[in-house]
From Swiss-Prot:
GO terms for biological process: division septum assembly; FtsZ-dependent cytokinesis. Disulfide bonds: none annotated. This is Cell division protein SepF. It comes from Salinispora arenicola (strain CNS-205). Keywords: Cell cycle, Cell division, Cytoplasm, Septation. Belongs to the SepF family.
Amino acid sequence: MGALRKAGVWLGLVEEDDERAYDDAGYDKGGYRESRYRSSRYSEDFGDEDDEDEEAAVPRSRRGDRSRLERAAARSGDVDHNVEGEQPERVERASVRSITRSAEPSESLTYHTRDNLALAPQPVRERVPADEEQRYQITTLHPTTYREARTIGEHFRDGVPVIINLTEMDEADARRLVDFAAGLAFGLRGTIERVTNRVFLLSPANVQVTAEDKAKIAEGGFFSLS
């Protein structure tokens, strides 16, 4: 064996078996086969145990990974099954729930507007007994100017029926006074009635003038009744 060949063997660049086979090739052709057989037998007898462990470890790790994946898949399947089983129960519970509210209306939430007040039922005024209706006095006024409208308003405000005789007024002032009397009766919830062409009767809300008295007024009996 040459020095360079030995150095290569020492450095691991050249295998020693190849060197031996090369040296024996010239003497015996069967030596190469024997050395080959010996090397294979040597590898079988004195093979590296680490190589076998590495080769066997690969399938084990793969089997371990496969088993872990199978367990994870089984767990996820159980979770999905549990979720699917819970969903119908949740839906059923949600469908059974009901909201109960108090049917009693709250008076604090009632807001009055102009439309509501117009449509709201008005309180019915109590009927005055017949004997009380007779307890009134009719005041007769003969205004000559529009300035006497204040006197008419004061009597009517005190609950006294007023007969307005406009025969002594001119046409323009008479119309103005009639308009005033109509507004006064409407504002105080009373009534205004035409007795003759220029005679009007103002009745307060709590006084009901009888038909007999109205007939006397129409005949010209402008007097006070007690």
